[in-house]
A protein has these predicted regions:
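Sec-dependent N-terminal signal peptides
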Residues: 21-29, 342
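An extracytoplasmic/periplasmic, membrane-proximal ligand-sensing/linker region
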Residues: 48-50, 193, 260, 282-343
Length: 343
């Protein structure tokens, strides 16, 4: 009996020791992941300090212009400043990586579009982030109507004249883009594929320096979001060739669409949205979505966006996540058929 009693005491001691070790381990796990959990009181107080909005694109571009207008109103609604932080490079992937690897505490937002979330993940090997795993989508903010424009000195004024010249002088025309995998790059390659033309790509570190070189007459063509060059178009410093929308735009009524210019199935509106690092607490993501959606419904904001050829969206986090997955599938097929490569 004494032996059995000792065995029982030993068994209880071992079991208690294992339980303590298990509970200690669970405590460490909870502490490690505590940044993913926001108590109700803390969630109600969010945000308690300024929020950084990582912008993978240069200042002055379409996404940057739209984001700064939204950031001001978002900050006013949240009661904290929203600071746009331009972190450019590698077609936007530098800023996207910074956003993906930031603490998931609700104080980092990252802008993302087709280039960083769809095209670069398809074209580039060893990308330092996964668009479907390393972000918590907040909302698709907008779709931006793009325009093909040229320096006023070019000898063509219409899409048909451009195609004729490109076919007569293959490889002698060139177009600028804000980097490999960017929306301007993909649209130009899609145009070449659909029209059977050979136009050389000149890649820049962002859309702003690319636009400047078209303004200077160093490069002949470029696709970009309309807000980036609307003032230069209206001043006659640049020439609009065609817009990618279904119908003509009120802000540039004399510029035809690609469809009416004879290029069928060429309707495209590059999009972009707001995301947070993966594992950002769900209540924070939902709060940011509600505030963004409210800002996008405000009449002055909608007027500012639509005047520049930007269509407000404001989709839910789930809808935006599904949209990213759909775009990955669609663009993977287009890139494969067109033979587009990272150059």
């Amino acid at each position: 009996m004494t032996i059995k009693g000792d065995e029982m005491r030993v068994t209880r001691f071992v079991s208690a020791t294992k339980l303590r070790r298990f509970l200690a381990g669970m405590f460490l796990v909870i502490i490690h992941h505590s940044s993913f959990i926001i108590p109700p009181a803390a969630a109600a107080e969010y945000p308690a300090r300024p929020i950084r909005w990582v912008m993978p694109y240069p200042a002055g571009g379409s996404f940057d212009t739209v984001s700064r207008a939204l950031a001001q109103r978002l900050g006013e609604r949240l009661g904290q400043q929203v600071v746009v932080d331009n972190r450019t490079g590698a077609g936007g992937t530098v800023g996207a990586e910074i956003g993906a690897k930031s603490p998931p505490d609700g104080y980092t937002i990252v802008a993302g579009g087709e280039g960083t979330l769809v095209v670069s993940p398809i074209l580039r090997k060893n990308l330092p982030y996964d668009p479907t795993k390393d972000f918590s989508p907040i909302t698709q903010l907008a779709s931006i109507n793009y325009i093909l424009f040229a320096h006023p000195s070019v000898p063509f004024r219409t899409v048909s004249e451009l195609i004729a010249m490109a076919k007569a002088k293959p490889g002698q025309l060139n177009y600028a883009s804000g980097g490999t995998g960017s929306a301007p790059h993909m649209l130009a390659e899609l145009f070449k594929y659909r029209t059977g033309t050979n136009i050389q790509h000149v890649s820049y570190k962002g859309s702003s320096p690319a636009i400047n070189d078209v303004l200077g007459g160093h490069v002949q063509l470029m696709f970009t979001g309309l807000p980036s060059i609307l003032a230069q178009l209206q001043a006659g410093k640049l020439r609009g060739i065609a817009v990618t929308s279904r119908e003509r735009l009120a802000s540039v009524p004399d510029v035809p669409t690609f469809i009416e210019s004879g290029v069928k199935n060429f309707e495209a509106s590059p999009w972009y949205g707001a995301l947070a690092p993966a594992h950002t607490p769900r209540p924070v993501v939902e709060r940011l979505y509600r505030e963004f959606a409210a800002v996008l419904k405000e009449a002055p904001i909608r007027e500012f966006l639509t005047r520049g050829g930007v269509e407000p969206v404001g989709s839910t986090p789930a809808e935006f996540a599904a949209h990213i997955r759909h775009e990955l599938k669609e663009w993977r097929e287009v890139i494969s058929r067109a033979g587009i490569r990272a150059d």
